[in-house]
Amino acid sequence: MSHTVKIYDTCIGCTQCVRACPTDVLEMIPWDGCKANQIASSPRTEDCVGCKRCESACPTDFLSVRVYLGSETTRSMGLAY
């Protein structure tokens, strides 16, 4: 089952989320917005199992990567009525 994976611009390019993902959903891509010149990307969300290990691994105060499961997707992203 795929889940929505959102990467925020607070990503510091540390690769912790990429290394924590057991299904290789995440990868790093070039980005000039941080010192590491890279940001996490989620090109394979169809493989996401919803374990949220990427969230747990994120060292930033505001999680740079979030996994939204099912109905949580619309509610958390402000899309629910």
UniProtKB/Swiss-Prot annotation:
It is found in: Plastid, Chloroplast thylakoid membrane. Its cofactor is [4Fe-4S] cluster. InterPro entries: 4Fe4S_Fe-S-bd, 4Fe4S_Fe_S_CS, PSI_iron-sulfur_center, PSI_PsaC. Residues 2-31, 39-68 form the 4Fe-4S ferredoxin-type domain. It holds the Pfam family Fer4_7. GO terms for biological process: photosynthetic electron transport in photosystem I. Its main location: plastid. It catalyses: reduced [plastocyanin] + hnu + oxidized [2Fe-2S]-[ferredoxin] = oxidized [plastocyanin] + reduced [2Fe-2S]-[ferredoxin]. Keywords: 4Fe-4S, Chloroplast, Electron transport, Iron, Iron-sulfur, Membrane, Metal-binding, Oxidoreductase, Photosynthesis, Photosystem I, Plastid, Repeat, Thylakoid, Transport. It is a peripheral membrane protein. GO terms for molecular function: 4 iron, 4 sulfur cluster binding; electron transfer activity; metal ion binding; oxidoreductase activity. Apoprotein for the two 4Fe-4S centers FA and FB of photosystem I (PSI); essential for photochemical activity. FB is the terminal electron acceptor of PSI, donating electrons to ferredoxin. The C-terminus interacts with PsaA/B/D and helps assemble the protein into the PSI complex. Required for binding of PsaD and PsaE to PSI. PSI is a plastocyanin-ferredoxin oxidoreductase, converting photonic excitation into a charge separation, which transfers an electron from the donor P700 chlorophyll pair to the spectroscopically characterized acceptors A0, A1, FX, FA and FB in turn. This is Photosystem I iron-sulfur center. It comes from Chaetosphaeridium globosum (Charophycean green alga). The lineage of its organism: Eukaryota, Viridiplantae, Streptophyta, Coleochaetophyceae, Coleochaetales.
